[in-house]
């Protein structure tokens, strides 16, 4: 073979490898990585050492509703942060899960607060984005309700973040929310609320609960007209690393609201899930009967069998592809209309 042909073949191979690398790297939002920074928080960067100080500065300095980007350098930030509705289109960029950590300890039992007030980070603003940040509540299982993050704004997107707590870790309170490649840790009702929330390619890790039951989701949907629910797609449900759940019954969800709606689809479910799958909210069996909607679609893994799932009302739903399509990013949260501008990668359909 002539030298020029060999060089040409080597060029093609190199180009193919580079293209593959670009495809693999495509899951990382490049524009987020290269976003223009308005503020930097952390040691050695500026005089701003706390996130609360950065938020206050942003409120004072920004003009209009143009996106405002705050870089939060690696470190543990022991503070409770509130992002009010007067700061829409805010982005917090961390240095990665387990590196940039926002940590709090407030709880219902330990601080005489409502669940709503315990959040380490509260997002009331629309258009919020976070990437590469751990949101943590260290109160522990015995402290009962202790929220790591509460989101009440619309069009919130989280990429490669971690949410760590026990009971009531992630409060998806209101609005359209999207979580991509995130880790959620908890023991009881640790994804809960009345938002339109989709979790895609996430790890959902169950921790040791205070009692003998562990429950992942608790939808607060109260009206059949509400287009709300908790959707888990292409994700992995497992015991938290190092956690032993012998003697513990683990359930996919229980109904906090009269018309609770949760859908688990195209996900891998480990053997920790009880064969019945779903649990009643104690004392509300007759109230919620035939109103709740729990569905599963094309899940895999030893905990995915629906043969012994509970059989009450709409709780036992093995849905068709046409039905599952209604719970995709495109259909359920109208993601095609707003997620592209966040630069967070997503799959719009099944």
Residue ranges and their predicted role:
Residues 2-350:
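Sequence-level preference for short, compositionally simple segments enriched
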């Amino acid at each position: 073979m002539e030298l020029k042909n060999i060089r040409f073949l080597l060029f093609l191979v190199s180009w193919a490898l580079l293209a593959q690398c670009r495809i693999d790297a495509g899951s990382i939002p490049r524009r987020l990585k290269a976003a223009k920074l308005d503020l930097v928080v952390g040691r050695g960067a500026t005089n701003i050492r706390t996130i609360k100080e950065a938020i206050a500065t942003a409120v004072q300095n920004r003009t209009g509703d143009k996106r405002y980007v705050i870089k939060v350098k690696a470190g543990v930030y022991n503070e409770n942060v509130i992002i009010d509705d007067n700061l829409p289109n805010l982005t917090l960029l961390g240095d990665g899960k387990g590196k940039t950590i926002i940590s709090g300890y407030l709880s219902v039992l330990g601080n005489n607060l409502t669940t709503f007030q315990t959040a380490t980070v509260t997002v009331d603003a629309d258009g919020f984005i976070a990437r590469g940040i751990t949101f943590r509540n260290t109160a522990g299982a015995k402290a009962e309700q202790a929220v790591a993050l509460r989101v009440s704004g619309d069009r919130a997107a989280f990429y490669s973040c971690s949410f760590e707590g026990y009971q009531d870790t992630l409060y998806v309170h209101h609005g359209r929310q999207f979580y991509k490649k995130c880790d959620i840790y908890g023991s009881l009702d640790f994804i809960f609320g009345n938002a339109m929330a989709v979790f895609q390619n996430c790890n959902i890790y169950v921790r040791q609960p205070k009692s003998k039951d562990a429950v992942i989701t608790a939808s607060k949907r109260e009206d059949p007209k509400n287009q709300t629910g908790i959707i888990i797609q292409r994700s992995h449900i497992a015991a938290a690393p190092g956690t032993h759940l012998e003697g513990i019954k683990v359930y996919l969800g229980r109904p906090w609201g009269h018309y609770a709606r949760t859908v688990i689809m195209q996900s891998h479910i480990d053997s920790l899930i009880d064969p019945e799958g779903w649990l009643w909210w104690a004392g509300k069996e007759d109230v919620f009967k035939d109103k709740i909607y729990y569905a599963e679609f094309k899940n895999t893994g030893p905990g995915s069998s629906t043969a012994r799932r509970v059989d009450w009302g709409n709780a036992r739903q093995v849905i068709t592809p046409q039905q599952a399509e209604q719970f995709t990013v495109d259909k359920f949260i109208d993601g095609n209309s707003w997620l592209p501008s966040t630069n967070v990668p997503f799959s719009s359909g099944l």
